[in-house]
Amino acid sequence: MTKLSYEVSEDINFLDKEKSQFIKDYMTSVKFPWLYSNCSTNIGDENSMFSNVLYSDNQENKYYIPICEDLIKHISPLEIIRIKANLTTNVDTYRNVFDYHTDFENIENGLTSIYYVNTNNGGTAFENGKFVKSEQNKLVTFPMNLKHRTVPHTDNNYERIVININYIKD
């Protein structure tokens, strides 16, 4: 694990290669449904995306087990708050900037982990100035109250796919 700052840590090769490739193949196949949203983090922000809430309100959907089982085993959360898969498409330039946000507020000992399903030149930017590049099988973890945002990709990959995991560790 590499600490990028006092708040952000990065785990490269988080899962074994076979499981990482399975998740990527599964989430880019016709077996996995993506739901369109005409905004990303704030209503009216004009940043569309696709998503699928895999776990929320103590309920998992049918796609939870094949995708999340190994992730959760490695993270070992005390309590899962939400797991959400996000897909954004490539853009021509970086002018399409997503807003800084937190996924949830006022949750004591809350953490957010982002698992990068595929590699591209986008990533996640943090309000403290740190940047994490989207690289397949990387997990970045940070306090839930640290503002972050999607940095869209401009390379030839059609999609940027991440799994956001919000949880309580201790």
Residue ranges and their predicted role:
Residues 132-149:
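Conserved metal-binding segment of the jelly-roll/cupin
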Residues 87-89, 117, 167-169:
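Short beta-strand segments enriched in hydrophobic/aromatic residues
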Residues 1-79, 91-94:
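Non-heme Fe(II)/2-oxoglutarate
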Residues 93-100, 108-110, 116-135:
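A short beta-strand-loop-beta hairpin characteristic of the jelly-roll/cupin
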Residues 99-101, 147-155:
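Short beta-strand His + acidic residue motifs that chelate non-heme Fe in jelly-roll/DSBH
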Residues 113-114, 139, 156-170:
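A short hydrophobic beta-strand segment most commonly corresponding to one strand
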